[in-house]
Amino acid sequence: MEQNISINEVMQAGQEKQLYRVLWVSSDQEYGYWISLEKQTRVPEKFICQEVIENISVGEVVVVEDPIRVYERNVAESAKERRDEWWRILKPILECEPDIYERRRRGELLSETAKKSNKNKANLYRYLVKYWKKGKTPNAFLPDFRNCGRGAKTQNQKKLGRPV
């Protein structure tokens, strides 16, 4: 049975059991690019498909369910507008696969886009990485509010400080 590696598949690999998202695979399944979902790295890594398939067959690499889901429900209209703006700006360079995964070419593409869109190159790169890590969908550009706020803890009713 011939196994293929699919785009957007999430795999757990290595001794540290790191999660990786497959970003692109060549048409002949020779090589591809993936990015770590857990490390702070922002650079896609090249991999050899045959090695990954062999590691899957021996259990060193496991295909897992996608831990990052981005939904559109309960999203403010302003957030949708911001998402659409970033999608419009980055879409031309996102279509330049596999060039976008090579460091030098990615820098050139981002510089050109920064000049055209009047946006900061660092911000473009930040949104590009966000797009890769969150599943290569336009909804990846939505604001990430799930980690904001205090949480469900109640405040202490007793006032702090010296008694009056």
Predicted regions and their residues:
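Secondary-structure boundary/capping micro-motif
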Residues: 1-164
